[in-house]
Amino acid sequence: MPDLLPYLGQAAYLQLESFQALSRVVGQVDDLSAKEKVALAAGASLSKHQGIIAEIRRRGDDPADVMKPFADAIDGFSVLTTGSDWRETLLAVEVTSGLLDDFFIRLAAGLPGDVGPRIAALLGSDGGQDGVMDVLRTEIGADPQLASRLAMWGRRLVGDTLLVARSALHLSGNTRTDEERIEPIFTELIAAHTRRMDALGLTA
């Protein structure tokens, strides 16, 4: 069971980071249709961030104070997952947000009271992924060499993202039982990630 405030603080800052990354991509994309699709995804991340912030405020806590312990680590994660061009960065947001949203939805089941269902519904809401996938598919179709580069980049992203997921777990200190508890969750996350990559025609 995750501790409520650290869970909310980390989840909120991750959504804020996703919004910032997508906003940067909007400024780098030339095609107006693609800009709109990425902007919609950025708006969805911001809405999720604001929803989590509302939960923090509902408890009478300051969102900045609750997010602060996670800022440096997530900022570092953002640097690691910023691509060499906007297409790599867009895939990075799709991969990392997909994995982490799925992960935090699963963790939400352990939150007290009715917070868990609210957060799970919020994180599971439409995040504009269909539009992002459309943009990526168009780019891959226009550049035959892009697919292999993005596939390799996507594989690298998974390891860094799962480290962030592990940092959100409340572990008992018993390595064997902790691993037994974590393994099924991570197996499900990887399966969902593989389906997303397959939808782009990329090898996970």
Show the residue positions of the predicted features.
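Helix-loop segments that flank and shape redox-cofactor active sites
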Residues: 18-39, 81, 97-112
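Extended, helix-rich structural scaffolds rather than catalytic motifs
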Residues: 146-204
